[in-house]
């Protein structure tokens, strides 16, 4: 959720690619980054990304970070937020995952650091990787399983919740998640 009460989301096809329910489904809409404003109007913020996944705004909402999951290895792209906060432009790589690295859902703290769910079943990568506002790795929280998503919670937004393959973990951190994220 953005401060203007718009909801931004991606619609990747991951859950429908297989034959899990007895048939292979097809996407209803292209895999874009979408914006739903408070009046209910849905628009495409950008179509310039292949299989977008996790996304989060910078603390000042001038940038949007988005995982581009079709690339191998995956890349967290960064876009400038333009047109009075309604569109995205100037896509560029922000974090290139090393081979085998799989960034997924992530959140941003008040200092602009990215806390990224990460991994694909190996103990050197499974957990949460933390990157500073320039994309430099500054921390790692090891988990015994792949971490798919994270969020900050608690009264002070200083508790990190980590949704992993089979478990939810949490710990208190020395920062706060951005409001709304």
Question: Residue ranges of each PLM-predicted region?
Answer:
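Short active-site-adjacent structural elements
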Residues: 123-128, 138-140, 148-151, 158-159, ...
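Short loop/turn segments immediately following beta-strands, especially the blade-tip
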Residues: 78-86, 172-180
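Short, solvent-exposed loop/turn segments at conserved positions within beta-propeller repeat blades
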Residues: 16-30, 69-75, 120-125
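Blade-edge beta-strand/turn elements of extracellular beta-propeller
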Residues: 30-51, 80-98, 128-143
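Short loop/turn segments immediately following the C-termini of beta-strands
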Residues: 12-14, 69-71, 81, 119-121, ...
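Beta-rich, blade/repeat-based domains predominating
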Residues: 1-7, 14-15, 27-33, 41-63, ...
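Flexible, glycine-rich phosphate/dinucleotide-binding loops
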Residues: 16, 42, 64, 73, ...
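Loop/turn-rich, solvent-exposed surfaces of beta-rich toroidal or solenoidal domains
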Residues: 72-81, 87-133
